[in-house]
A protein has these predicted regions:
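Short, glycine/acidic-rich hinge or "gate" loops at secondary-structure transitions
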Residues: 8-16, 56-57
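Generic hydrophobic, aliphatic-rich segments that mediate packing or membrane embedding
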Residues: 1, 16, 38-42
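Alpha-helical support elements that line or immediately flank enzyme active sites
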Residues: 1-8, 100
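Predominantly the structural core of cysteine protease catalytic domains
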Residues: 24-156, 161-192
Length: 192
């Protein structure tokens, strides 16, 4: 959406997360299982076949095995990522990307504290994982801003708007720039 605003495209819409997820799983041959996805493949999918509006194929996770209707694929061709790039986890590059008006997506390792009631209520995840904390999986999100005073990134989650700060949360700079905690960082620059 941000790249559409930046490009001043006539129609601005929220991309369908489930359309991307299904087509990503198709690339990875994992449609039969809800096993997550690689961001790189999701970006490739949007580059190859585009994405339809969320309103057309809404995020209903129970439909993760269902192929979107043909109309979604026709509409998706109007919105293909034609210029995208991988980013390094260098703080200056990540902040520079955001300062230029481009959000970025990335994956991060989720630890138990991220799913705490406090993070769900406030959206603030202010610390790195503790040594005795267990990893419970990975998650893909979109970074939309940063706060130098607090040393954290502002991130959009794909979960409902009742979670965190109306669907947003924060992670410390040190979390997002750690190659042991975050990876697969991409930005889309042009959609056509």
């Amino acid at each position: 959406m941000f790249d559409q605003i930046k490009q001043r495209l006539a129609q601005i819409f929220t991309p369908s997360r489930l359309f991307i997820y299904y087509n990503n799983a198709s690339l990875e041959h994992t449609i039969a299982s809800d096993s997550g996805a690689q961001i790189r493949d999701g970006i490739k999918s949007v580059g190859k076949q585009g994405d339809c509006p969320e309103a057309e194929w809404p995020y209903v996770i129970a439909k993760f095995k269902t192929r979107p209707p043909k109309s979604c694929y026709v509409d998706a061709l109007k919105y293909k990522a034609v210029l995208y790039q991988r980013l390094t986890p260098a703080l200056s590059q990540l902040k520079g990307c955001l300062a230029s008006g481009y959000p970025f997506v990335f994956g991060f390792t989720v630890y138990e504290s991220f799913e705490s009631p406090q993070v769900a209520r406030t959206g603030h995840h202010a610390s790195l994982p503790k040594p005795d904390e267990s990893s419970i999986g990975g998650h893909a999100v979109m970074c939309v801003g940063y706060d130098d005073a607090k040393q954290w990134f502002i991130i959009r989650n794909s979960w409902e708007s009742k979670w965190g700060m109306k669907g947003y949360f924060t992670l410390p700079y040190a979390y997002v720039t750690s190659v042991n905690l975050a990876s697969d960082i991409w930005t889309i620059r042009i959609v056509e």
